[in-house]
Design a protein with these regions (language model features):
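N-terminal membrane-anchoring alpha-helices
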Residues: 1-56
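Conserved alpha/beta-hydrolase "acid-adjacent" motif
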Residues: 267-273
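Alpha/beta-hydrolase active-site loop
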Residues: 144-165
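The serine-hydrolase catalytic nucleophile loop
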Residues: 106-120, 133
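Short beta-strand/loop motif that positions the catalytic acidic residue
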Residues: 253-255, 260-262, 266
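Hydrolase active-site cap/lid region
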Residues: 185-241, 249
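Conserved alpha/beta-hydrolase
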Residues: 121-140
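N-terminal cap/lid segment of alpha/beta-hydrolase-fold proteins
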Residues: 51-95
């Protein structure tokens, strides 16, 4: 009898420890480790499969250098739970009243996910607000919101833009990966009337679906029981359940104009999730653009002209062209 109880106790302890590890591994704040310019060869010696990271950091540095030549302003706002959030406003030479609020993805940054897109937006005369997600960059926070807490941060940035730029400004929300989940979830919240539409690039349907997919793909593990207990740890430490973190449910409350873009070769966030997101939206003119051959968050890099065309058609529909 006692050995049975001991076995159950040991199994429970292992499950708790594994759940805490999973939560901290996935959602605890960690700084980005930059590959310094000139250090690529040494990095590849240690990480033979790291060419994608090398190219990503090269793109970040190029975007930074470009941004330094533009007119920029550092912005801050306060989150609903008291965190100081940071963003960078980039303006064209002759700024108008249109602005793209750009939300980066998981453990990324604005220059990483919008390095090329921000140039396109400025060429079209838009201002660009690159936000640092909570627990990223210069924003405060110990744990990632994984799109759920961030949806309210996005709402706060929308209000900040509306307050500073006035009633005549027009705002489009644009997110990549976790940033897409953020703006899609924000679409289900009451937003300022200045918000005209939402662009989601390779977003997931819910945290539960996404973590479940990664558990199966990378670790060959079922969602039960680990994801249930990890969700409980997240609720205790970060304040939300994986199950409630569901952009797909938020879209059921939204009739904001919607454009979804997704790479057909994405095996990190399955393309099927975008189809479910599209189906959930109440926007009668909603559109899904699939990019053949594009892996996760690579649609713009693979097909920039098609991406730009889809965005401009969307802008014409919402009166922001």
């Amino acid at each position: 009898m006692w050995w049975i109880l001991g076995a159950f106790g040991t199994a429970a302890l292992v499950l708790v420890l594994a759940s805490v590890f999973l939560f901290r591994f996935a959602l605890a704040r960690r700084p980005l480790t930059e590959i310094p310019e000139g250090g690529e060869r040494e990095y590849l010696k240690r990480h033979p499969k790291g060419q994608a990271q090398v190219e990503w950091w090269a793109g970040v540095r190029e975007a930074r250098r470009w941004t330094e030549r533009q007119h920029t302003e550092e912005w801050e706002t306060r989150s609903f739970d008291g965190l100081l959030l940071h963003a960078l406003l980039i303006s064209p030479a002759h700024p108008g009243n249109r602005v793209a609020l750009c939300v980066h993805g998981y453990r990324s940054c604005g220059h990483g996910d919008f390095g090329q897109i921000q140039r396109f937006y400025l060429e079209q005369g838009l201002r660009v607000l690159l936000v640092d997600d909570r627990a990223h960059g210069k924003s405060q926070g110990n744990y990632l919101g994984f799109g759920w807490l961030d949806r309210l941060d996005c709402k706060a940035w929308c209000q900040e833009l509306a307050d500073r730029l006035g009633p005549d400004c027009s705002i489009v929300l644009h997110g990549v990966s976790m940033g897409a989940a953020t703006v899609l979830a924000a679409a289900g919240e009451p937003l300022p009337s200045q918000v005209k539409g939402v662009i989601g690039d390779c977003g997931y349907t819910s945290a539960w679906d996404q973590f479940g997919h990664i558990l199966k793909r990378d670790f060959h593990l079922p969602v039960f029981p680990l994801l249930y207990t990890a969700s409980l740890v997240c609720r205790i430490c970060a304040g939300y359940w994986f199950q409630e973190d569901a952009p797909v449910k938020q879209l059921e409350k939204s009739d904001l104009p919607l454009l979804i873009i997704h790479g057909e070769a994405d095996d990190y966030v399955p393309t099927a999730m975008s189809r479910r997101l599209l189906a959930a939206s109440r926007d009668p003119g909603k559109r899904l653009v699939l990019v053949p051959g594009a892996a996760h968050a690579q649609s713009y890099a693979v097909a920039p002209e098609r991406y730009q065309q889809a965005v401009m058609e969307f802008f014409r529909r919402i009166g922001m062209a």
